[in-house]
Amino acid sequence: MATETRSQDGCWSCRLRKKKCDERRPICTECMCLGLECHGFGTRPAWMDRGARQKAQAAKMKQKLAQLTKNRRSKQARAQEDCAVKQPPNSHTEGPKVQTDVAAASNGMLIDHESCSLPQTFGGTSQDEFAKSQGAAGHEEEIQNTIVADPLVSSGDSGSPTMFDDMTFLNGYHVPLASSGNSGFQASLEEMDFLSEQNFDLPNLESILTGSMHMAPSTAVVGVADDDLCSEYLLPESQVCTAYPLNGTSSCMLPITDMEDAMLLAYYMEKVFNWQFPFCSTPASGLSQGCFLWLMSKSRPLYLASFALSSSHKSHQRALADPSSKLRYEDHAGRYDVAREEFHCNWKAPKAADEVSMLACIVSFITSSLIHGDKVDWTCQLRAGTSLIAPWVTQARPETNSSPLKSPEESSRDFFISSIIRIDILSAINQDSAPALSHNYKELFKSAHPKFSLEAVGGCHNWVFEALLDVYLLRDWKKKTRAAGLLSLWELTSKATTIQVDLEKKIASNVTLLRQSKEELEQQKGRPLQSDQCQYEIYVINHTFACAVSVLLEVIVSGAYPQLPEVKQKAGRALEALTDIKDARLLEVVGWPLFVVGCVVEEERQGFFRQLLSGQMRNSVSLGGLLDLLEECWQSRVSGEVKDDNFDFSHLRFHKSRNVLIM
């Protein structure tokens, strides 16, 4: 019996806890059901050392499980109290039955996802349904009894407690080369479900991966992850007692019920929107303030998620202006809870929810993690987002000049798909491997008329991200071959040279366009056209990101030696590009280059980053915490904790017990 619960080939979280893992990709069921971070199936984490760090990680995991259990029970109690208070006067005869149903559904919340679905009536629960919920509650209680045990100690076959034995080293997650086509994403897609209704086609996985499925422009196909994909989407117990109708996407007007909501809406449109989507004014953008407001009026989840983000952003700015005012997640937790509840209702709805609002909600939740990094798990949101965009990405067809104008829904959908693609690619810098959809992204970017344009989201052309994906894949190849003892320096250099030659050609071409654009602006004598100004800014962002990509490529090939001529030259060029940016609005979107270049510059050049991030950009929301991360990197290299020859940006994946988002 003991051997059935031991995991030698599962995710690292289950292996640490000695629990059986179903090895679901990209995240296993066990971790999602319990609300734990799944550390995946790649290379052995640094903390898995069979020593102090491993014990500390196990203790941290145990503490988190205990806290989750405590929070869940507190919510159950509050939910029952709220329901009792909110019952109408003529329902006193069915009161006990309502409370029983709430408790039963709550007890099964973390284990039986189907029990999360709201019944049509609460007073008519059958005995079979009640027994089922009680069974789920008993099963959940059994798991809780298991997880409170010390995760560092497990019972072997003999039943006696034993410490962790040696764990078989797992190779990194396989990222196929271009010749393998879409097969590399098989592991990530094989468990997906797809919602459907009258206006939605029901694709099968084989047709998606082989490219045989036809996607008409008027047909929306939404790929929805498995129920166990993300524990954050589990319906909270308080949902049963909500005072608002939970009909998913609504066609009604914005339900502004009080002055606070009206002020948050005004603040979002005035401050947050332009910060969140700084390049919406470009011709290629498919989103505007009016379009976003229209989307909010049709989608209650997006409306609530946007208000939660607006509330957090407003408090963040207030805390910066007034030292006595502190930014506390608890002050906004209620808004985020309700937003997630509504999001979950759309996610689990029998009708396919509006995919535009779902994508927009995910982008808003990920953006919120920049403010509440220790409370909002962006990795969970991103996994949900990539599962939603997978059918669109794998089946995307190049646009043609004769393509008809897109509807507002189509333009907005493409914009938010591009947003998730951008986040997925940039955030991989300090993760274990390249994005699972890397080869699909590359195919999109090669098109002369790509369906998804990333410049509309972050001001950076697709060719930069295509080069970055090549560098990521080279990094993964180097890790895999080195672990197998098969690394060929000649082959590594050859692959890197191919990438570098193509990248340098595009950098030179962009520099030419940058200079021409700058001359045109100067000829307009201080009153440039908005379109010309936007185009110039895009060339600036292109150059900055591309120079940072060249730095990353050099580090992968030669190591992170700041004094090495190749690294020094590439870092110096990137630093010059960063120095030329004076506009704080543009600096907000170059966090990724600041991180990459800042990690490998010489000691005498570190002052630029300290001065910028503690001076001009000290109040930045997007760059908050970046200086602390760089200081940690510099200190770890000075102390010898991290060696230059094996420097990997994944060393900086976690900071202050949170997974750092770089974008």
From Swiss-Prot:
Q: Give the record's keywords alphabetically.
A: DNA-binding, Metal-binding, Nucleus, Transcription, Transcription regulation, Zinc
Q: Where in the cell is it found?
A: Nucleus
UniProt keyword Zinc present: yes
Q: Which GO terms describe its cellular component?
A: nucleus
Q: From the UniProt record, give one GO term of the biological process aspect.
A: positive regulation of transcription by RNA polymerase II
Q: Which PROSITE patterns match?
A: ZN2_CY6_FUNGAL_1 (PS00463), ZN2_CY6_FUNGAL_2 (PS50048)
Q: Which PANTHER family match?
A: TRANSCRIPTION FACTOR, PUTATIVE-RELATED, TRANSCRIPTIONAL ACTIVATOR PROTEIN UGA3
> What function does the entry list?
Transcription factor; part of the gene cluster that mediates the biosynthesis of the meroterpenoids arthripenoids.
The protein's name is Transcription factor atnD
Which source organism does the UniProt entry give?
A: Arthrinium sp
